[in-house]
C-alpha cells in the first residue's frame, strides 16, 4: 500500500521519522539516567549509603593498593655478580 503522491512531502522512505524516533529514544534514556543518578544521590544522603558501603570498599581498595605496591629499584642496594 502506498500513500498518494499529494500527501508525500519528501520521499525519504521514513528516514526523517526514524531519526526523530531515535532522538526521542536518546533523550528518554538520558533523562532516565539523570533520574537514576539523582535517586542514587538521594539514597546516599538519606540512607547513609556512603558510610555503610562506600567507606568499607575504600578501605579494602586502600589495603589492596598497599599490598600491591612494589618498592622502587635502588641503585646502591643492587648486588652485582
UniProtKB/Swiss-Prot annotation:
- Give the record's GO biological process terms: disruption of cellular anatomical structure in another organism; viral budding from Golgi membrane
How does the record classify its membrane topology? Single-pass type III membrane protein
| GO cellular component annotations of the record | host cell Golgi membrane; membrane
Q: Which UniProt keywords apply?
A: Apoptosis, Host Golgi apparatus, Host membrane, Membrane, Transmembrane, Transmembrane helix
Q: Does the keyword Transcription regulation apply?
A: no
Among InterPro entries, the record links this protein to: E_protein_aCoV, E_protein_CoV
Q: Does the keyword Transmembrane apply?
A: yes
Which one Pfam family would you cite for this protein? CoV_E
Cell compartments where the protein resides = Host Golgi apparatus membrane
Superkingdom of source? Viruses
Write out the topological domains of type Virion surface: 1-19
The residue ranges crossing the membrane are: 20-40
The residue ranges for the Intravirion side of the membrane come to 41-81
The record describes the protein's role as: Plays a central role in virus morphogenesis and assembly. Acts as a viroporin and self-assembles in host membranes forming pentameric protein-lipid pores that allow ion transport. Also plays a role in the induction of apoptosis.
Q: How does it assemble?
A: Homopentamer. Interacts with membrane protein M in the budding compartment of the host cell, which is located between endoplasmic reticulum and the Golgi complex. Interacts with Nucleoprotein.
Stated name of the protein: Envelope small membrane protein
User: What's the source species' lineage?
Assistant: Viruses, Riboviria, Orthornavirae, Pisuviricota, Pisoniviricetes
